[in-house]
């Protein structure tokens, strides 16, 4: 990936997407086919039991996937289908880190 593309994607992933800012998500690293996105757990991200809300976890993964794809295909992408298995809870005060990795880049 060129430095220009890296810089553009970092701006997009941190400064130009209102949903990410609203939910405290930050793109922290990009490489060809990978993207690292972090989420410091705030009260607004928790469910009524004090764990991370499933929707915010799914969104974190979705953002990492989309950013990883954009390192390889310089166009906007959308998720058509996704599945997630929740293995354990994340608590307030923790920071979650997810790495999206492209295994296979499909066609258009």
Regions found by a protein language model. Name each.
Residues 1-108:
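Terminal targeting signals and extreme-terminal segments of soluble enzymes
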């Amino acid at each position: 990936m060129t430095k220009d593309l890296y810089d553009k994607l970092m701006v997009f992933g941190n400064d130009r997407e209102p949903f990410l800012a609203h939910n405290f998500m930050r793109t922290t690293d990009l490489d060809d086919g990978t993207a690292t996105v972090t989420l410091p757990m705030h009260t607004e991200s928790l469910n009524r039991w004090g764990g991370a809300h499933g929707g915010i976890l799914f969104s974190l993964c979705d953002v990492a996937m989309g950013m990883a794809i954009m390192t390889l295909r310089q166009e906007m992408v959308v998720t058509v289908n996704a599945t997630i298995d929740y293995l354990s809870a994340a608590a307030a005060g923790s920071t979650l880190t997810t790495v999206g990795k492209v295994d296979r880049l499909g066609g258009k």
